[in-house]
């Protein structure tokens, strides 16, 4: 009996029509096809090649599967098993560390999600046996800048992976992959007999130095030796050395940036609480060596959101525009950005207090910001507005939302796609201006730019319901190919947000990074003596989301902001149906928690009753006052 031709279903949950694998758009509702390729942490031999498991996962190899029903929630267990807790707690390291997608039906294999993987315009895998190309196969032919950048990304991951006892992953080249300009780990390898040290990392790098680019071979070899012999005891020293080497290598390239941004109130809102910087003439977009883009989504009251988003942008732009970035170290720039975000926060918070705004009347704003200088891109975010990094082969979401769903994941309580089904999953746990800056924890990152790419900054008016994942190839990628200009792309994304979402204001900013070679500047050998001084620099730093700043290592108050709870929007009915979305599940830990509270309450009542009968002295029966530290923060 011939095997039926595999089909892929529409990702729109109100449609789910069956389409051919070659289809770019759904034949019923015209939603762009999403092809989500997944990796299984265990090899599964299908009944026959090209067959599907549980009529859903198309087997392309024993460990590579295509989800043919992307709108359907994956299978997840009632309780989170120990073997995936590290993935969940390393959620802030995405996209370097893959997300757990769910269980492969009727197996004990876990499916891992990388966002996008290299594929052709028709959706065919470019690396059908590897899914994502191996670092080891690309290393020897890579440019000096690329090699240093890959080592730099590994160094940033060392501390968080060590904290979860999975640092062995960085010593196994088979698990290290390169997806666009991002180093991704295929899966995590758990430390077994001993926990790897920097000496082990140094031995590995020293071995790789044999095939390093001739201009940096000395640097990589000596850096490996210093790690191997214990002369470097802090991974931040290695990061500082790599920073200096990269700064030398980038001199052969010229960097320029163009930004176009637009905001729109949307079809169903009379006012616009979003704000954006910069606003420029679409006919005259400047090319800059340094650039700044800011997107804010205001929350709180009819007029409060507009005030908060506008004042935040005005304050940040006025401060950042005065920075001499080329004279500052990465650590100082990150420190300045943190200081300025906290400053903007306190301005809004103090205005809330002076105007006696309470609960839902308090105003605040989400924030995403991209600051570029030469080969460096600094990113900051607070709230659930997002930043995506687009290259010719990839679209990576490089921010994680500050909401309850993400918090459940990084605490190890839930798988992300499962947590999205929880009530109030989109409730913010922080926003600029809602609380004093002592309770604010801005997320900051830094990336190196190897080649042409685009950063998309947007509010949830666009990012909701996977619109970016659906449309980036058709609307943003043509800009990189020279087939579309920035204003056209931004206008298209605004139109998509209004037509396919339409429930909120929408703001979009595109930052186009262009890298060209400077033919008049030859490649020069970077020696160890050129970078060794970085070992003694006192201002060592690390991106705060890749330096162990998880909930178990920082005293972060991430209780939900009552006044910023975002109602779960109803999916637009594109094809005219009136089906309801599946009911959102309660957290799996909620029932045991309620039971424990009931038991403890009963026990407390019994204890009080017994004490009253034992000692009738009324002065001795007064319960102690509750300590301030034991109470929840009231809004």
PLM feature segments, named:
Residues 24-25, 30, 38-39, 50-51:
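Long, low-complexity intrinsically disordered regions enriched in Ser/Thr/Pro/Gly
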Residues 19-20, 198:
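ABC ATPase "signature" C-loop motif in nucleotide-binding domains
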